[in-house]
């Protein structure tokens, strides 16, 4: 049980979302939810009880669009027991989430890839804590009428599609009539899904490494001049949905929401595996000793493992200048990374494994006030 060291002067509230908040959304607009400190039901690991007589705390976050469906639903769920904390989350993309927390423009940033040492050095508010908040996957979704629903793709085929060397769907599957042009859709903004696919292609396709000239994955898509670039997961999803012949990489939650057909990918064990919550969970189960410097689970081991899986990370300042805000933020994120994981499966995410939840909790115990005193004791 998390115990705060300071008097609770406020609770966490979120603007009521109504029924719309209960469903995932591919919108790129800000999500506003009113939440409050978790009480005994459902109960947050940091303790505390809701007190609607105290002032409201407003929290702001920005970053990965991949996390938006889960965060929207988790914040809404949290609000039902904690009605006095407002959470405004803008799905602006991982790179913006990092730059916003660096500039101290938000209470928390969100990124599919943890901040690097050079990123951390640019933070204007002091040391930053990074904690895992959800476990998702990247689907390879395609829109080809009449295409087999169990299409299998390996890394070399994907590499040649995104290098513009394979341009007709008949080259992928002989059962598909020739003459259907492949439209390769990628992220125009720096993104976690782009990083994950780049890492998978580096691991599985020498052709990709030769063409891109790197053995280090990048959040910026390395072959931006091939195919069509779109902003955020919502942009890629919309383009794939509206364009016959299109293929794109999309957070699995968005693919599920749009009822896309997704390819099975060749994993390290030699099996073709489709994205499902079970195959994503299998990837997360191999995340031993997870940390912000040891986070990569792309192309992991295990026959049932989906190779494009990832954790999403919340980024917060260790020193919280406003105690009430820091307590509210810590309680919110501790609840989302534990009890709030009950919202994962219906939206296409896998719940965080117990050992990863423990990593998140231990990270939040490091929160301090401006003098260096701990905000929570356990």
State where each predicted segment sits:
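Bacterial N-terminal signal peptides that target proteins for export
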Residues: 1-9
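Core hydrophobic alpha-helical membrane-spanning segments
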Residues: 12-14
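C-terminal motif of bacterial Sec signal peptides marking the signal peptidase cleavage site
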Residues: 16-21
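Flexible loop/hinge segments at secondary-structure junctions
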Residues: 23-24, 31-378
């Amino acid at each position: 049980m998390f115990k705060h060291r300071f008097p609770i002067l406020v609770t966490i509230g979120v603007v009521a979302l109504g029924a719309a908040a209960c469903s995932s959304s591919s919108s790129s607009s800000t999500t506003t939810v009113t939440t409050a400190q978790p009480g005994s039901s459902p109960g947050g690991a940091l303790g505390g009880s809701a007190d609607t007589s105290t002032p409201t705390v407003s929290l702001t976050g920005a970053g990965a669009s991949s996390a938006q469906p889960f965060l929207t639903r988790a914040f809404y769920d949290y609000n039902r027991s904690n009605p006095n904390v407002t959470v405004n989350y803008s799905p602006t993309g991982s790179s913006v989430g990092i730059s916003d927390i660096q500039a101290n423009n938000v209470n928390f940033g969100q990124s599919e890839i943890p901040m690097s040492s050079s990123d951390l050095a640019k933070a204007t508010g002091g040391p930053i804590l990074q904690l895992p908040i959800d476990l998702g996957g990247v689907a390879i979704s395609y829109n080809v009428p009449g295409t087999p629903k169990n299409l299998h793709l390996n890394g070399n085929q994907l590499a040649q599609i995104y290098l513009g060397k394979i341009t007709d769907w008949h080259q992928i599957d002989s059962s598909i009539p020739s003459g259907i042009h492949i439209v390769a859709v990628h992220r125009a903004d720096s993104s976690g899904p782009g990083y994950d696919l780049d890492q998978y292609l580096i691991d599985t396709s020498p052709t990709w490494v030769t063409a891109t000239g790197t053995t280090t994955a990048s959040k910026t898509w390395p072959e931006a001049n091939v195919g069509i670039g779109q902003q955020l997961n919502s942009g890629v999803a919309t383009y794939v949905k509206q364009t016959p012949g299109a293929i794109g990489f999309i957070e699995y939650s968005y693919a599920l929401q749009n009822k896309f057909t997704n390819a099975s990918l060749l994993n390290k064990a030699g099996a073709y595996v489709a994205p499902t919550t079970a195959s994503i969970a299998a990837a997360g189960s191999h995340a031993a000793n997870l940390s912000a410097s040891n986070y990569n689970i792309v192309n992991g081991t295990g026959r049932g493992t989906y190779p494009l899986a990832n954790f999403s990370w919340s980024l917060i300042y260790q020193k919280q200048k406003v105690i009430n805000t820091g307590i509210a933020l810590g309680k919110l994120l501790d609840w989302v990374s534990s009890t709030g994981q009950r919202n994962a499966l219906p939206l296409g995410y896998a719940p965080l494994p117990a050992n990863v939840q423990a990593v998140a909790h231990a990270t939040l115990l490091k929160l301090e006030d401006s003098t260096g005193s701990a905000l929570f004791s356990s």
